[in-house]
Amino acid sequence: MAASAGPEIERLIGLLAKLPGLGPRSARRAALALLKRRDQLLAPLSDALAEAAARVKTCSTCGSLDTQDPCAICSDGTRDASLICVVEEVGALWAMERAGAFRGRYHVLGGLLSALDGVGPDALRVGPLVARASEPGVREVILALPATVDGQTTAHYLAERLAGAEVTVSMLARGVPVGGELDWLDDGTIAQAMRARRPA
Amino acid sequence: MAASAGPEIERLIGLLAKLPGLGPRSARRAALALLKRRDQLLAPLSDALAEAAARVKTCSTCGSLDTQDPCAICSDGTRDASLICVVEEVGALWAMERAGAFRGRYHVLGGLLSALDGVGPDALRVGPLVARASEPGVREVILALPATVDGQTTAHYLAERLAGAEVTVSMLARGVPVGGELDWLDDGTIAQAMRARRPA
Ligand SMILES: [Zn+2]
Ligand SMILES: [Zn+2]
């Protein structure tokens, strides 16, 4: 791209273009929208990013993101500590929360096993999951993983690893369409899959 | 949207969702990408936005955006001061610069006349354009406006207003597809339309 907009604006466009969903063209549109709406958009977004950079951290219990550690969900005494819902990423946790079908705790794996991408168990938060599942009072681990090859491989691997802990291991029902990533599903589908979950 | 990700992250998602090209879902993905790539993406974008908010201003001559006023283009002595290219918005100016087919100066109107949206001449930078066009040494004003109803209405209005100034008034050739916004065009189309421009 020619440096037509000055180095500061080109740098801003370049960074915006790295966001998923924004290509080089839409990044330019976004930069322009920001620069035209300085007080309503540019300044607040700048503040929100600075605050997120300074304050948001990873929950040492579940792996979610929050400004407190343990996170608000892990600290919430009204939530059912006997249920742990395992998700691939924080985006899937957010989708579960929006669906409002689950009132237990979470465990963010940080990815899926993948032979193709060379992701093994050590790259995921599997050990901490087994440890949490073995704590007294934990009754059920729900594997809310995508219905993809990697998702199902990971689910079966986790079911084996959790066999030693005295917990029921379940999976989301087949309401999740094949190949479907959780965070692209509508809330109703997620709620239904949660209600109809089955043993792994 | 349920406040599933904590107020700070929800605020960030809400602001990202206001960017053109990002809906609520892609804004969540973007927020997650930012939070996962703190050092490579979140911190640099936060800095770039803060710098843009502090340093980028509107050029008092042409209406473009830059960290200096007059902007780099208006200050560039190697550019042809006898040509003024009128564009709707800064995004169109950037598109012209990327096409590399124009080495004169610009004038950013700040919009188009629109009966429907109630945009009259006073809402646009028409007076300053007429003043600039009347300065000695200005030879041609090129109306690089979109080939839409509002774009063409605006072009004809400007041609009338510029009749008193001793300048040639031209328009981009019909290489610009009907309904086409300049900043979505490929560079070759823009360059061709510039070369084949015709009297307004
Ligand atoms: Zn937590
Ligand atoms: Zn300028």
Curated annotation (Swiss-Prot), chains A, B:
GO terms for MF: DNA binding; zinc ion binding
Superkingdom assignment: Bacteria
InterPro entries the UniProt entry points to: DNA_Rcmb_RecR, Rcmb_RecR, Rcmb_RecR_Znf, TOPRIM_dom, TOPRIM_RecR
ZnF (C4-type) intervals: 59-74
Signal peptide: none
Gene3D superfamilies: 3.40.1360.10, 6.10.250.240, RecR Domain 1
Domain Toprim: 82-177
GO biological process: DNA recombination; DNA repair
Keyword Metal-binding attached: yes
PANTHER family, A to Z: RECOMBINATION PROTEIN RECR
Function: May play a role in DNA repair. It seems to be involved in an RecBC-independent recombinational process of DNA repair. It may act with RecF and RecO.
Name used for this protein in its record: Recombination protein RecR
Source organism of the structure: Phenylobacterium zucineum (strain HLK1)
